[in-house]
Amino acid sequence: MGDSEIQYLLEKLKKLEEDYYKLRELYRRLEDEKKFIESERIRYEREVRRLRSEVERLRSPPLLVGVVSDILEDGRVVVKSSTGPKFVVNTSQYINEEELKPGARVALNQQTLAIVNVLPTSKDPMVYGFEVEEKPEVSYEDIGGLDVQIEEIREAVELPLLKPELFAEVGIEPPKGVLLYGPPGTGKTLLAKAVANQTRATFIRVVGSEFVQKYIGEGARLVREVFQLAKEKAPSIIFIDELDAIAARRTNSDTSGDREVQRTMMQLLAELDGFDPRGDVKVIGATNRIDILDPAILRPGRFDRIIEVPLPTFEGRIQIFKIHTRKMKLAEDVDFKELARITEGASGADIKAICTEAGMFAIREERAKVTMLDFTKAIEKVLKKTTPIPDLKGVMFV
C-alpha cells in the first residue's frame, strides 16, 4: 500500500471522526430539547387539569346558607334556611360533628338540602378593620416620665401573656383589664402603642365612638363581634380609646340615642365580666373623663387595675424634652432644666409641639441648629394657645 493510499485513508478517518462528533453533539441537543418538551407537556397537562377543575367548580350549582337550630338524637339536624322555613336534613360524613352546634352557619345542597360545609361566623367588615396589622414604632424608651405607669401596665398586660406560669405558681388570676385615665396629651394612647409594639399578641384598636351606631342593636353587635374576633385570634389585646363615649354614667334620659348608647355599654359590661370566660384577651381602656364613667365599669373584675397618667413632673418634662430633641441639632445654650422649669403644667403633647415649633423658628431663620431663644418663643406660642379661654358668658360684643 502506497503513501498516497495511506494519506487518503487517514483523511477519510479524520472526516468520519468529525462527523461522529457532530452527530453526537446533535444527539445531545435533541435529547435536551426532548426533555424540555416533556417538561412543558407535563406542565401544560397540569394546567389543563387545573382549568378543567376550575370550570367544573364554576359550573357547580350554588349552595344555600342556613343556620343550625337543633341537633336530633339520630344525627339529623334541624336547619333554618335563608329563605325562611326550617328543614330536618342529613349531614355529610366529612363534616366535623363538633363544629355542628346551634347557631352555626352551614352550606346546604340546593336539591337535597343536606349540609355539605360549615361556614365561619359572620362578622361586620368594620370589625376586621379594627385589627392593627402593622405594629406601631413607639417603644417604652419613647415615653418619658411614666416609669411607674409603664411598670404597672406591663405587669397587668404583658406578663400574663408572656409568663402565665408565674400567676399559676402564686395561685392568683392575672388582671383582666387596665384603665388609663388622665388629662389630654399625657401619653395614654402612647402607652397602648408601646404595648402593641412589645407584645406578639393580636392588637385590636377601637375608638369608643365607633360603637355608637344608628340602629338599635348594631352597637351591641359590634361589641360582641370585636370580642369574638379577639377570642379567635388569642392571645390578643383590645384597646378602647375614648371609653367615655359609650361608658358614661347611666341617666333617666328619654332620648332613643342615649338609650342605645346605654344598651351598647351593657353589652360591653357583659363581655368584660360575663358568663363566658375571655381567655387570653386583655382589655386596655383610656379616658380623660373618669368622673363621668359608670360605676359598674370601674369595679374590679372588669378593669382590675386603674392607672392614673398625670401631667409630667419636673424630671418627667426633662426626659420628654430629651426624647423629642434626640434627632434635633441643638445649640450649646439649650438648658433642659430651665425648659422644664418654665413649662410647669405642660403635657407631653405640649412639649412635643414646643419642640416642633422651636425647629420651625430655626428653619424660618435658615439655621441648622435650634437655640434656647427658639424654645422660649415656642413655649410662649404653644402654652399661650393651650391656655383655657376665659368665660365670656353674659358679655355682649358690639
From Swiss-Prot:
GO biological process assignments: proteasomal protein catabolic process; protein unfolding
Molecular function via GO: ATP binding; ATP hydrolysis activity
A matching Pfam family: AAA
Listed InterPro entries: 26S_Proteasome_ATPase, AAA+_ATPase, AAA_lid_3, ATPase_AAA_core, ATPase_AAA_CS, NA-bd_OB-fold, Nucleotidase_PAN, P-loop_NTPase
NCBIfam families, alphabetized: PRK03992.1, proteasome-activating nucleotidase
Domain notes: Consists of three main regions, an N-terminal coiled-coil domain that may assist in substrate recognition, an interdomain involved in PAN hexamerization, and a C-terminal ATPase domain of the AAA type.
HAMAP family, per database record: PAN
Protein's name according to its UniProt entry: Proteasome-activating nucleotidase
Source organism of this protein record: Archaeoglobus fulgidus (strain ATCC 49558 / DSM 4304 / JCM 9628 / NBRC 100126 / VC-16)
Organism lineage: Archaea, Methanobacteriati, Methanobacteriota, Archaeoglobi, Archaeoglobales
